Every structure is written in structure tokens, then in C-alpha cells.
Amino acid sequence: MVFRSLIRTFAPIMMKYLLDLTVKAVERIHERYVLIRLTDGKPLPEMVPGQFVEVRVDGSPSTFLRRPISINFVDRELNELWLLVATVGDGTRKLADLKAGDTLNCLLPLGNGFTAAKQGEKVLLIGGGVGVAPLLYMGAEMQDKGIEPTFLLGARTAKDLLLLDIFKRYGRAFVTTEDGSEGEKGFVTNHSILQNERFDRISTCGPTPMMKAVARFAKEKGIECEASLENLMACGLGACLCCVEKVKTSIDQTTPDPSYSGGETTNVCVCKDGPVFDVKRLLW
């Protein structure tokens, strides 16, 4: 019997759900990554690109805390939730061992999301490593609205590019690799599309050095930019304070955000107030 309950949290924007989801498939897409497809007997809750899930890892004494994982994709027709998992520790390795038919307890959806694209807006989605995960869902949602997304994906080598064929289904996909084995050689900020085309907004997720470089580029070009931070998280609700990040109280320091007070900077919980932030608020 599926256990379903509503969770009231500090984040009032969307209701949170505690669900026992059924594993539909686990696909090894890379030596360090698996794609977990989950389903439920009832329609999955509303989720927006950029939000994440806290999953409970059962059967492992060293994984008391839940693991935060970005929402990779939501297939409404098949009623599936996709999670792209990097196997970096005991907890995520345990998740990679799940089999079809197993149950995974999930708290979702958590955090905020990327700014929804508007008609006529040209949006560039830049990702690296497992940070490409939330951008797939973002691109799919844009396509559903008749807006063509542009993806710029970076990796060390061609074999490290994740889900590239699926990204190509939802928009234009450009690639950089550090060794030049696929796409243009170098980092995402070196790609020629940044010089050849003009974008209204950039959404990015991936390694912090990459996102900082993207933020610098956006500032130089006067492009709106938001980044999804990957701080260590535990509760996902803003209670444990382990994901705190110091940010500016406002974007321009002249019109303070009324939600905060007490100076030019403030501490926020990435899990509750983020993970997506306007880069002008970040102390980068």
C-alpha cells in the first residue's frame, strides 16, 4: 500500500509530499551515473524545473540522512519521475543497486525552480557533469510552451556527456569537451555560440567554478543569469541549516529584499530559499 502524506514546511509555495514511489527501471548510463525512473499508482504531484527530491536510502547503516537529488525529468504521459544519480558514496551506490519493483521513499518537490521562460525569450541552459540534470526538464517544459531551448553542455570527454541524445530531442544542443573528443574543445564559456548569438537569459547548473565563469560572462554581456547551487544538504526543509549560504540582501544593494533585514548580506538556506538564485545575489 502506497503511503502518501502531506507535509507542511517552511516553504509555502508548493505542498510537499512524502511518497513511496516504485522503481520502474535503473539504467547504468555511465560508470559513475545511473538513471532511476520512478512511478506511482496516482498522478505525480506538480513539480517545476530546478526543484529537487530528498530520497531515503534503506538498508545501509551509514546513510541515516536523506540524499538530495535534482529532478531530471517528469514524464506526465508515463507518470514517471527521473532522477540522475552520481554514485559518489555509500548512499548513492546503494541507490544504484535498486531494482525494478523496489520502493524508494521520496520527499518532494523541494526548493524553488528556474524562472519560467516567456514567449519570445531566448534562453540558454548551461550545464556540466551531473548538473545537466535539471536542465533537461527545463528544456522539455520550454518546448511544451512552443519555446525552443538552447543547451550548452560541458564535460571532460565525449563519454562523460550525459543523456546527450535525449537533450537533442528537446532543443538545440551544443557541446564542449576538455579534450576535444566531442563538440568544441575547451570549457563551456569558450564555445563559439556565446559570441555568435545573443541570449536574454542564462540558467546554469554544474560545478561551482563553471557556474562562476558563466556568471562572469553574463555580467560582462548584460545577460540575466540564475544558478542552481549544489551545497551539501540534509533535511531539505531549511531546518538543519547545513546548507547555509551567505548572499546579498538584494540584487542591486539599493532596494533591499523585504524578506531580509540586518545589513548588506544575509544567510539563507539553499534547500529552502534556493537552490536557484539570481547570480547578482551570490558573493561570487
For the regions a language model picked out, list residue spans one by one.
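Short, surface-exposed secondary-structure boundary micro-motifs
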Residues: 58-60, 109, 248
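Short, positively charged and aromatic/hydrophobic N-terminal segments
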Residues: 5, 9-10
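Intrinsically disordered, low-complexity terminal tails and inter-domain linkers enriched
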Residues: 249-263
